[in-house]
Amino acid sequence: MIIIITGTPGSGKSTIVDLLSKKLGFEKLHVSSFLIQNKAFSEYDELRQSYVIDEEKAFQLIDSFIKDKNVVIETIYPSLISHADKVIVLRKDPRVLYTELKRRGWGELKIAENVMAEILGVISGEAKEYFGNICEINVTNKKPEEVVEQILSNNCDNVDWLNIEEIQDLLISLDKVISSYEDSISDE
């Protein structure tokens, strides 16, 4: 059985994967660190402070690792996994997520892009497009153990941050941050 746990950075994926894999007795795979260890990247993006994944190599490595295993996979790249029995998308209130990423010391552009992705449901949309049936869980203000129980009971949420006016305002300010970086790059 393959269970994918995905969501924007800061949504709690690693913690949930650790708890869920232990509870089920499954192996776990933290995709980003696995790909870095196996040098499945093409370059390092200084501006975004992250590796650019070599998707073909990554897909092959992951497919080989998960073959014939019961595994819980933590990833922000759901399309790198060939198949899954269950896909869980962790969603977190963008205002809370913004604070969490800032606390981690992330750069302004990286925070803006990731919080905007959460508001717009980018990872959720990608997972839905790739796998069809997904389960979104709003993890905001929930203990990790509560989230694991919600996953096991298949109790999904319907998350739409764009219905909240304050979040619409946040989206506009994030867009300005991203645009200012894009403008500075095009000026070079």
UniProtKB/Swiss-Prot annotation:
Its EC number is 2.7.4.3. ATP binds at residues 10, 12-15, 104, 142. The keyword Transferase applies. Interacts with uS11. Not a structural component of 40S pre-ribosomes, but transiently interacts with them by binding to uS11. Broad-specificity nucleoside monophosphate (NMP) kinase that catalyzes the reversible transfer of the terminal phosphate group between nucleoside triphosphates and monophosphates. Also has ATPase activity. Involved in the late maturation steps of the 30S ribosomal particles, specifically 16S rRNA maturation. While NMP activity is not required for ribosome maturation, ATPase activity is. Associates transiently with small ribosomal subunit protein uS11. ATP hydrolysis breaks the interaction with uS11. Coiled coil: none annotated. This is Putative adenylate kinase. It comes from Sulfurisphaera tokodaii (strain DSM 16993 / JCM 10545 / NBRC 100140 / 7). GO terms for molecular function: adenylate kinase activity; ATP binding; ATP hydrolysis activity. It comes from the Archaea. It catalyses: AMP + ATP = 2 ADP; ATP + H2O = ADP + phosphate + H(+). Residues 103-113 are annotated as: LID. It is an enzyme of class 2 (transferase). Keywords: ATP-binding, Kinase, Nucleotide-binding, Ribosome biogenesis, rRNA processing, Transferase. GO terms for biological process: ribosomal small subunit biogenesis; rRNA processing. Gene3D superfamilies: P-loop containing nucleotide triphosphate hydrolases. Belongs to the adenylate kinase family. AK6 subfamily. Residues 30-53 are annotated as: NMP.
